[in-house]
Structure formats: C-alpha cells, structure tokens
Amino acid sequence: MKIIHLLCLLFIAVIAKAASPVEALLERIDKGASGKFIIEQIKSPVDFFELDQKGNKVVIRGNNPVNIAVGLNWYLKYHAGIHLSWNGMQAKLPEVLPAVVRKERHETDMKYRYDFNYCTYSYTMAFWDWERWEREIDWMAL
C-alpha cells in the first residue's frame, strides 16, 4: 500500500512539473530551453515580472504565467538579443545565456489589456488548427 501512495505522489510531482505553461512555451521556442531558466510564480495584487540570476540560470518571477511569459520575452529581447515575432516564434538560444547582472522588476497598473481587432475573428481564426492556436496563445502571452 505504501508503494502505491509513493507512486501516486511521484506521478503527481511529475505532472505538476510538466504542467508549467511557461516551461512548455520555452520548449516550443527551443527544445531544452526550459532547463536554462528558473520559473517562479509569486502571489501579488500587482501585475509584475522580475528578472534575476541564480548560478548559470536566469530566474523569471511573476504573479501569473502570462506576466512570467512577458518577462521571458523581455529577457530574450533586451538581454539575449533574440527577437520573437508573430511570424517567427522559434529561436536557437545560446548554450550559456547572458547573465542578468542586476535584478530587474517591471510592474503595470493597467487593469485591462487586449489583443486582436474585430476583423481578426472573421478573416482568419475560423480556419486555424490547434497548432496555429497554440502559436497565437504563445504570442499573446509574450
């Protein structure tokens, strides 16, 4: 009986680790990239992300997965010189990522943010498959 409980706990731990949406996003950008980052979600009433360094890993903190993804995009653009766009969501990250020299925090006081214009829904979205939707969701998060 104890072995069953242990196996259940291990299974839950694996599922919880693999379920991180930002780590999955990193893997879609570049296979193996999630191992170069430490992702931390912290409760906060303010939308924010932080960039920090721990050893050879970049730490990205935020109050939810979307703000962590925004932090990832900020890091890639302003620290690593990697530009992701609506048409190109994959990149080859360097073996050793550029270090975050000084802890960096960005907050927003905007309560609402939006994406798309009213035409997008009629022109193209009706024809998207899951792969295309996944790319769009990634882009919205970044």
What are these regions (language model features)?
Residues M1-L9:
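Sec-dependent signal peptide recognition
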Residues L9-K17:
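Hydrophobic h-region of N-terminal signal peptides that target proteins for export
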Residues P21, L25, K31, S44-V46, ...:
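Feature activates predominantly on carbohydrate-active enzymes
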Residues M1, A19-S20:
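Absolute protein N-terminus
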Residues G35-I39:
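A short, Trp-centered hydrophobic/proline-enriched beta-strand micro-motif
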